[in-house]
């Protein structure tokens, strides 16, 4: 080819260097406009699309060195269906076929094989441009040296860029999953977060939107591929290209992925239906397929014909045809089977699924923002220049002529291009003939492909046999797993039986050891009894100190409980705050959504306002021109219409640009908002999950609360039963000793409990920290937590009710304890009879205490063992899962190996077929060479004809220019005439208007004067009649006569002036009528002149149209010439390339044979390795199964041990709980036991004497036994004389055996009683726990009651103080009143009724008690639990007594007052005695009534 394609490669290189917004550094200057201005924008859209899909892709034309990085060959040669016309183009290929060349290049082998194959397929690459067409203007081709330099530079640079790019993209994509083929909206939130899930858009879907300029003319070789340089307008389009959808954002590897066969078949077929017929068929016809795919491709070509006929535009889109070849090859490469081939990146195989994926939305938005910033200034400059052109075209008078000249230039370009089209359509028809021949070859090749399908059937049968083997292996695996499960079940059963037998054995051993220990302890206890009494006294003092410590601990626990309640309330307040914050955030989100909608509406309204302002600007300019040239309105209507059309087009362009910019801005804003909303949604999802977990925890807490309530009730019942049993079985000494031991154990337990509570406090602090960390998560869970809070409140109410019930039960228990204490006193009398049993039980209790401690140690050790076993079990489970996954991977690898083997067999057959096809290609290439030589000769003849035509065209040009100059002169003269006529017409109209106005004014003035004169005349006539009447009556008055004469003279003057005015009016009317006739004549003359000028204009238009036709024909001929010259140059270069390709193909055949042999050897080695690997994996699987069985046995044994340990642990915990329960009962007994301690010491002394006697008797019995044994031996040695003594000895021995049996029975009974007592102790411990909790709750309640009662007491004290003061005041008043009454005369006293003596009672409350009451309360004792109830009872008693006393006092005062009030009217003193008492009595009554009301109420 010539240097123009190299320049295109340079432009592609510059574009890929600088990105979509940068211009090439050395742009080509255009020879002239290529298309009319009204089609420039359409061409720009198409070119922009091509620049975005091809120019920016790194897999564009001119790429070499694709050997190292690219798809590994599924078979080591190109597809067998290629003939010479479909070979890929070399480094100087046009951009229109970039994708197809790239596919062919990628289907080649590794770096070692690629160099030879690239040379061998040179002619295939360079013959492809004959199938493509690109319309561009011609420039002089570059020199050959410069062309070679450009080619080399482009090739080197593209090789480097491709290597770097592929490695980088593979590193980025190695971790990403394969893309989904689902179709989604680009605004889907899931796709915003996971952009790799977007469907892959084919380049056809992009070019389809902008293929405005397609033509239905059959095409020959593409102009761009024939060596013509691209029009410089592409530089602008690359700059002003807009991003209209996410498909335009596709990164550089999307083309690589599509060309590699990753484009889905449905997308490709859809795109190919919308191609032009010749561009689709040119590639489809050269690839042999199976009959199904052949029919499909014929259908697609027919659909392409129909689509191209429907789309009736008269130009071409080269980018569209280039995309069509890529899409078509995407289908074909899928049918051949190269879609899933792995890629080579630096020698490593990478699966094809990882290529061709989209970048993230973030990268896309950043790139769009950068491009938008780069393009903003240039786009604004273009818009401003267009606005200036609009204003200038509208405002200037010469705009019509300029637009006509531009139209002429555009039409000339159009005719020249149509000439090129005619020349190229001839070549296209020849290409269609070649297509028919190639289709015949394709039918022949399809038969060969059927033979290949039969071979694939045989390989499929072999694959079926292998799959059956895999199924048998799977069946064996299932059988093994079943056997494993059966063995595991058997092992578990055996282990369980073993464990039960072991447990029985251990129990038997423990019983034996206990019996032996009891026998020994009975001997030891005799000696230790003396020491125990001394120890008991010390333990009593220690127990009192321990009790005080326990009470202190109880107070600390209550304070901790209050602190935890305060923390819970603070957390609830924090939760409410977060709920409010959540509501505020939701409102803010709604507000933001509304603001976004308002912004969008504002943008739309701004766009509408912009358009409206532009239209107003245009309309104002048109009004300005119309006011200046109103007379030229009809003459310039056509020019104004053209100007309006052009202005509308430019306005639409500017508005479209602004809409696009606003659209990109809105899309970016929407993307950002959507990402924010997605973040919020994820956060809310997390919060919902946490809320669900919290709800589950709340449900668990509720369940535990219910269980505890049930346990509490059961324990209360058991407690009652146990108390009944205790009354029957306990003795005073036993209860004392057990209480001492129980207090010791309880002290230990309380210490452990304290440690647990401290641990719980630390865990609560940890949970508080966690809650503070999870504040953000709790925002969404607040709504759910409300319901939880309500349920918790209900639970709290239930707990309060439960606490009330428990407090009642506690009081009942206290009463029962009082009763039982009496029973205990009764039982103390029976201690002497049950001393032996008590000693045995005490020994058993000590043993059980030791056993409990041993159980604890065993439980802790076994817990550790269980945790270790759980960890080992988890580890083994994870190893099992890994082994299973490895087994699945081995099966998958085996299947892939079998599939690879069958694929390689198919590839070998295809390679052989392809070698036969290449020989046929050589022959067809030789035929083409002969045809080209004949075509060259015909082209030389055409060239001579073209020279003659150009000379004739030059002469015609000169004539046309002269005619155009003459027409312009005539048009300017005509314009001047029209202007003059218009100015004359306007001046005449103005004069007419002024004269008409003056005439109307004069007529108005005259009519007013006439009316005035008429009115004066009527007045004068009336006066005259009056005077005449008066004159008739009185003829004597001369003065009246004179006045009448004067009036008549006046009347004559007025009539004279009236006649003058009428004459003037007639003259004015005549003058105005003459002027009107003259103006009408002038207007008629002007209209005649206007008609003449219109006829002259029509003649000028006819001349201009003829000139245009001649110029268009001239340009048409020029276009034909250029098209012929281009095709001539292309054919010459194509001929030379075909000659070089013939030699390279022969060398390529030898290379292909070697590669096939190497591939077969490598495949056999891989098969052998896979077999070895499968065998090794099966062996390792069997070993792992054995390991798993052994581990399962171990796990089963560990489970049995864990169950045993759990039982022991439960028994120990029950014992501990019973011990705790008994603690409170024993606390009440401690004081009584202290009193009984002295009695017990005396009894102990007696008991020790009895024990000493028993021991002495035992020693005597043993000595007698030894003596008897000696005597027996002596008697046996002697004659049997002492048979009687032997019988006596036997009888004594039987008695001893009976005593031993009775002792054993007593031991058994004591064991049973010990067990019962242990159970009772465990239940007592549990009761103690529950009572502790209830006591804590009671403490909180009693504290509240205490505060309330203290407040009431303070009120009562205040009332008492006021009552005392009022009482004293009343007494004083009464004494004064009595003294006054005594002083009055006795006569008055005797005449009045005798006054009853008033007796005011003293205050019933003593002064000492009042002082004590009015004093501040004493300090609270340090033992609140013991003293609270007594304090409360005292307070209640005091309140009741105070209230009763106040009521009695109020009644007495009221009675005394009522008895005293009847005396008041009888007394005639001015100040009666009741005068003082009355007003004071009322407040007294009020205060008394108030006190009486407050008393019961309180």
From Swiss-Prot:
<feature type="compositionally biased region" description="Pro residues">
    <location>
        <begin position="27"/>
        <end position="36"/>
    </location>
</feature>
<feature type="region of interest" description="Disordered">
    <location>
        <begin position="166"/>
        <end position="195"/>
    </location>
</feature>
<feature type="site" description="Cleavage; by caspase-3">
    <location>
        <begin position="139"/>
        <end position="140"/>
    </location>
</feature>
<feature type="modified residue" description="Phosphoserine">
    <location>
        <position position="57"/>
    </location>
</feature>
<protein>
    <recommendedName>
        <fullName>Golgin subfamily A member 3</fullName>
    </recommendedName>
</protein>
<feature type="compositionally biased region" description="Polar residues">
    <location>
        <begin position="269"/>
        <end position="291"/>
    </location>
</feature>
<feature type="compositionally biased region" description="Basic and acidic residues">
    <location>
        <begin position="1376"/>
        <end position="1387"/>
    </location>
</feature>
<feature type="modified residue" description="Phosphoserine">
    <location>
        <position position="18"/>
    </location>
</feature>
<feature type="site" description="Cleavage; by caspase-7">
    <location>
        <begin position="311"/>
        <end position="312"/>
    </location>
</feature>
<feature type="region of interest" description="Golgi-targeting domain">
    <location>
        <begin position="172"/>
        <end position="257"/>
    </location>
</feature>
<keyword id="KW-0007">Acetylation</keyword>
<comment type="function">
    <text>Golgi auto-antigen; probably involved in maintaining Golgi structure.</text>
</comment>
<keyword id="KW-0175">Coiled coil</keyword>
<feature type="compositionally biased region" description="Basic and acidic residues">
    <location>
        <begin position="789"/>
        <end position="801"/>
    </location>
</feature>
<feature type="region of interest" description="Disordered">
    <location>
        <begin position="1"/>
        <end position="118"/>
    </location>
</feature>
<dbReference type="GO" id="GO:0005654">
    <property type="term" value="C:nucleoplasm"/>
</dbReference>
<keyword id="KW-0597">Phosphoprotein</keyword>
<feature type="compositionally biased region" description="Basic and acidic residues">
    <location>
        <begin position="1440"/>
        <end position="1452"/>
    </location>
</feature>
<feature type="compositionally biased region" description="Polar residues">
    <location>
        <begin position="173"/>
        <end position="184"/>
    </location>
</feature>
<dbReference type="GO" id="GO:0045296">
    <property type="term" value="F:cadherin binding"/>
</dbReference>
<feature type="site" description="Cleavage; by caspase-2">
    <location>
        <begin position="59"/>
        <end position="60"/>
    </location>
</feature>
<feature type="modified residue" description="Phosphoserine">
    <location>
        <position position="465"/>
    </location>
</feature>
<feature type="modified residue" description="Phosphoserine">
    <location>
        <position position="1392"/>
    </location>
</feature>
<feature type="region of interest" description="Disordered">
    <location>
        <begin position="789"/>
        <end position="809"/>
    </location>
</feature>
<dbReference type="GO" id="GO:0032580">
    <property type="term" value="C:Golgi cisterna membrane"/>
</dbReference>
<feature type="region of interest" description="Disordered">
    <location>
        <begin position="1440"/>
        <end position="1498"/>
    </location>
</feature>
<feature type="modified residue" description="N-acetylmethionine">
    <location>
        <position position="1"/>
    </location>
</feature>
<feature type="modified residue" description="Phosphoserine">
    <location>
        <position position="385"/>
    </location>
</feature>
<dbReference type="GO" id="GO:0005794">
    <property type="term" value="C:Golgi apparatus"/>
</dbReference>
<feature type="modified residue" description="Phosphoserine">
    <location>
        <position position="983"/>
    </location>
</feature>
<keyword id="KW-0963">Cytoplasm</keyword>
<feature type="region of interest" description="Disordered">
    <location>
        <begin position="216"/>
        <end position="325"/>
    </location>
</feature>
<dbReference type="GO" id="GO:0005829">
    <property type="term" value="C:cytosol"/>
</dbReference>
<feature type="region of interest" description="Interaction with GOPC">
    <location>
        <begin position="121"/>
        <end position="141"/>
    </location>
</feature>
<keyword id="KW-0472">Membrane</keyword>
<feature type="compositionally biased region" description="Pro residues">
    <location>
        <begin position="71"/>
        <end position="81"/>
    </location>
</feature>
<dbReference type="InterPro" id="IPR051841">
    <property type="entry name" value="MT-Golgi_org_protein"/>
</dbReference>
<keyword id="KW-0333">Golgi apparatus</keyword>
<feature type="coiled-coil region">
    <location>
        <begin position="394"/>
        <end position="1459"/>
    </location>
</feature>
<dbReference type="GO" id="GO:0005730">
    <property type="term" value="C:nucleolus"/>
</dbReference>
<feature type="compositionally biased region" description="Low complexity">
    <location>
        <begin position="315"/>
        <end position="324"/>
    </location>
</feature>
<comment type="subunit">
    <text>Homodimer. Interacts with GOLGA7. Isoform 1 interacts with GOPC while isoform 3 does not.</text>
</comment>
């Amino acid at each position: 080819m010539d240097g123009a394609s190299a320049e295109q490669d340079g432009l592609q290189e510059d574009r890929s260097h600088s990105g979509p917004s940068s211009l090439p550094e050395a742009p080509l200057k255009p020879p002239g406009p290529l298309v009319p201005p009204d089609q420039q924008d359409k061409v720009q859209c198409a070119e922009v699309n091509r620049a975005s899909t091809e120019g920016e892709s790194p897999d564009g034309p001119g790429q070499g060195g694709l050997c190292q990085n690219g798809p590994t060959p599924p078979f080591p040669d190109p597809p067998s269906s290629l003939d010479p016309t479909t070979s890929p183009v070399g480094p100087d290929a046009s951009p229109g076929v970039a994708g197809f060349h790239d596919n062919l290049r990628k289907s080649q082998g590794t770096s070692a094989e690629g160099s030879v194959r690239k040379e061998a397929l040179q002619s295939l690459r360079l013959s492809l441009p004959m199938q493509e067409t690109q319309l561009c203007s011609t420039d002089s081709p570059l020199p050959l040296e410069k062309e070679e330099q450009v080619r080399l530079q482009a090739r080197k640079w593209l090789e480097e860029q491709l290597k770097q790019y592929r490695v980088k993209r593979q590193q980025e994509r190695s971790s990403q999953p394969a893309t989904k083929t689902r179709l989604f909206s680009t605004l889907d939130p899931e796709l915003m977060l996971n952009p790799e899930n977007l469907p892959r858009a084919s380049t056809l879907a992009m070019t389809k939107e902008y293929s405005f300029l397609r033509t239905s003319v059959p095409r020959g070789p593409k102009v761009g591929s024939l060596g013509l340089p691209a029009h410089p307008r592409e530089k602008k389009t690359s700059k002003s290209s807009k991003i209209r959808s996410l498909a335009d954002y596709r990164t550089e590897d999307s083309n690589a992925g599509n060309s590699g066969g990753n484009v889905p078949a449905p997308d490709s077929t859809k795109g190919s239906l919308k191609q032009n017929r010749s561009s689709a068929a040119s590639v489809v016809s050269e690839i042999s397929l199976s009959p199904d795919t052949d029919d499909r491709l014929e259908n697609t070509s027919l659909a392409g014909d129909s689509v191209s006929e429907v789309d009736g535009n008269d130009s071409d889109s080269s980018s569209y045809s280039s995309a069509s070849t890529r899409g078509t090859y995407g289908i074909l490469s899928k049918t051949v089977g190269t879609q899933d081939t792995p890629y080579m990146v630096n020698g490593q195989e990478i699966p094809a699924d990882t290529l061709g994926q989209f970048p993230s939305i973030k990268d896309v938005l950043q790139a769009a923002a950068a491009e938008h910033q780069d393009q903003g200034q240039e786009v604004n400059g273009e818009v401003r220049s267009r606005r200036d052109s609009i204003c200038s075209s509208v405002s200037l008078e010469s705009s019509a002529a300029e637009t006509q000249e531009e139209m002429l230039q555009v039409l000339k370009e159009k005719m020249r291009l149509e000439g090129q089209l005619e020349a190229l359509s001839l070549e296209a028809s020849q290409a269609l003939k070649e297509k028919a021949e190639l289709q015949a070859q394709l039918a022949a090749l399809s038969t060969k492909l059927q033979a290949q399908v039969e071979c694939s059937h045989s390989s499929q049968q072999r694959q079926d046999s292998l799959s059956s083997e895999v199924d048998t292996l799977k069946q064996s695996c299932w059988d093994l797993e079943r056997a494993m499960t059966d063995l595991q079940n058997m092992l578990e059963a055996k282990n369980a039986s073993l464990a039960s037998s072991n447990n029985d054995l251990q129990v038997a051993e423990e019983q034996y050891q206990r019996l032996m220990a009891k026998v020994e302890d009975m001997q030891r206890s005799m000696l230790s009894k003396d020491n125990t009494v001394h120890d008991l006294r010390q333990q009593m003092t220690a127990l009192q100190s321990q009790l005080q410590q326990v009470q202190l601990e109880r107070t600390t626990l209550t304070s901790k409980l209050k602190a935890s309640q305060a923390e819970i309330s603070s957390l609830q307040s924090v939760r409410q705050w977060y709920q409010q914050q959540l509501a505020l955030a939701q409102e803010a989100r709604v507000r933001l959504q509304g603001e976004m909608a308002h912004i969008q509406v504002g943008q739309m309204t701004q766009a509408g306002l912009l358009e409206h302002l532009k239209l107003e600007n245009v309309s104002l300019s048109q009004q300005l021109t119309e006011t200046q040239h109103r007379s030229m309105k009809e003459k310039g209507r056509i020019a104004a219409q053209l100007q309006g059309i052009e202005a509308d087009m430019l306005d639409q362009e500017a508005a479209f640009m602004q809409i696009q910019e606003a659209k990109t801005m809105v899309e970016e804003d929407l993307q950002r908002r959507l990402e924010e909303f997605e973040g919020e949604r994820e956060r809310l999802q997390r919060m919902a999950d946490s809320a669900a977990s919290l709800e589950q925890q709340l449900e668990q807490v509720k369940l535990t609360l219910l269980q505890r309530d049930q346990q509490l009730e059961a324990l209360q019942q058991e407690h009652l039963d146990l108390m009944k049993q205790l009354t029957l079985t306990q003795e005073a000494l036993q209860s004392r000793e057990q209480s001492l031991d129980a207090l010791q154990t309880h002290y230990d337990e309380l210490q452990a409990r304290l440690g647990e509570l401290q641990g719980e406090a630390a865990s609560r602090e940890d949970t508080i920290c966690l809650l503070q960390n999870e504040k953000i998560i709790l925002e969404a869970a607040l709504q759910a937590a409300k319901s939880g809070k309500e349920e918790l409140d209900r639970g709290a109410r239930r707990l309060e009710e439960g606490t009330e019930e428990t407090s009642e039960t506690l009081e009942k228990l206290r009463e029962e304890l009082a009763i039982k204490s009496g029973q205990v006193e009764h039982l103390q009398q029976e201690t002497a009879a049950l001393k032996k049993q008590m000693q045995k039980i005490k020994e058993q209790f000590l043993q059980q205490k030791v056993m409990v401690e041993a159980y604890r140690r065993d439980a802790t050790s076994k817990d550790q063992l269980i945790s270790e076993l759980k960890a080992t079990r988890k580890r083994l489970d994870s190893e099992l899962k890994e082994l299973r996954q490895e087994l699945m991977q081995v099966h998958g690898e085996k299947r892939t190996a079998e599939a690879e083997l069958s694929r390689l067999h198919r590839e070998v057959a295809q390679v052989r077929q392809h070698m036969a096809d290449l020989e046929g290609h050589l022959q067809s290439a030789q035929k083409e060479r002969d045809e080209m030589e004949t075509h060259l000769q015909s082209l030389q003849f055409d060239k001579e004809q073209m020279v003659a035509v150009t000379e004739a065209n030059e002469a015609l040009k000169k004539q046309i220019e002269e005619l155009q100059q003459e027409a312009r002169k005539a048009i300017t003269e005509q314009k001047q005439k029209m202007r003059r006529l218009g100015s004359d017409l306007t001046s005449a109209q103005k004069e007419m208007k002024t004269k008409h106005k003056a005439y109307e004014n004069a007529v108005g003035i005259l009519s007013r004067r006439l009316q005035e004169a008429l009115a004066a005349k009527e007045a004068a006539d009336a006066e005259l009649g009056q005077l005449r009447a008066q004159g008739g009556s009185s003829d004597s008055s001369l003065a009246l006569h004179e006045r009448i004469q004067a009036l008549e003279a006046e009347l004559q003057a007025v009539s004279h002036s009236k006649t003058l005015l009428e004459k003037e009016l007639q003259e004015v009317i005549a003058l105005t009528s003459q002027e009107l006739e003259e103006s009408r004549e002038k207007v008629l003359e002007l209209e005649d002149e206007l008609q003449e000028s219109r006829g002259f204009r029509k003649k000028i238009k006819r001349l201009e149209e003829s000139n245009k036709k001649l110029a268009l024909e001239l340009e048409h001929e020029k276009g034909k010439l250029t098209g012929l010259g281009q095709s001539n140059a292309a054919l010459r270069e194509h001929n030379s390339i075909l000659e070089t390709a013939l030699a390279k193909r022969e060398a390529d055949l030898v290379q292909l044979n070697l590669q096939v042999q190497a591939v077969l050897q490598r495949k056999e080695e891989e098969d052998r390795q896979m077999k070895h690997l499968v065998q090794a994996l099966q062996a390792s699987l069997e070993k792992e199964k054995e390991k798993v069985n052994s581990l399962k046995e171990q796990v089963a044994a560990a489970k049995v041990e864990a169950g045993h340990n759990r039982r022991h642990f439960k028994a120990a915990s029950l014992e501990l709980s019973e011990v705790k329960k008994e603690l409170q009962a024993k606390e009440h007994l401690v004081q009584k036991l202290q009193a009984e301690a002295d009695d017990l010491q005396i009894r102990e002394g007696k008991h020790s004497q009895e024990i000493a006697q028993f021991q002495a008797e035992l020693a005597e019995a043993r000595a007698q036994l030894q003596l008897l044994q000696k005597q027996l031996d002596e008697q046996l040695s002697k004659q049997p004389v002492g048979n009687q003594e032997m019988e006596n000895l036997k009888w004594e021995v039987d008695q001893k055996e009976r005593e031993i049996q009775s002792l054993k029975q007593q031991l058994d009974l004591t064991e049973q009683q010990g067990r019962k007592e242990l159970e009772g102790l465990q239940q007592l411990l549990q009761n103690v726990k529950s009572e502790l909790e209830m006591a804590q709750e009671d403490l909180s309640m009693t504290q509240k009651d205490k505060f309330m009662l203290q407040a009431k007491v303070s009120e009562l004290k205040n009332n008492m103080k006021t009552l005392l003061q009022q009482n004293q005041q009343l007494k004083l008043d009464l004494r004064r009143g009595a003294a006054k009454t005594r002083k009055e005369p006795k006569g008055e006293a005797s005449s009045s009724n005798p006054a009853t003596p008033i007796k005011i009672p003293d205050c019933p409350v003593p002064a000492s008690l009042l002082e004590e009451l009015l004093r501040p309360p004493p300090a609270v004792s340090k033992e609140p639990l013991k003293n609270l109830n007594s304090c409360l009872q005292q307070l209640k008693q005091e309140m009741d007594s105070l209230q009763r006393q106040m009521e009695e006092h109020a009644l007495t005062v009221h009675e005394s007052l009522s008895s005293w009030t009847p005396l008041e009217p009888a007394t005639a003193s001015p100040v009666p005695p009741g005068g003082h008492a009355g007003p004071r009595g009322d407040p007294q009554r009020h205060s008394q009534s108030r006190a009486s009301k407050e008393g019961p109420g309180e």
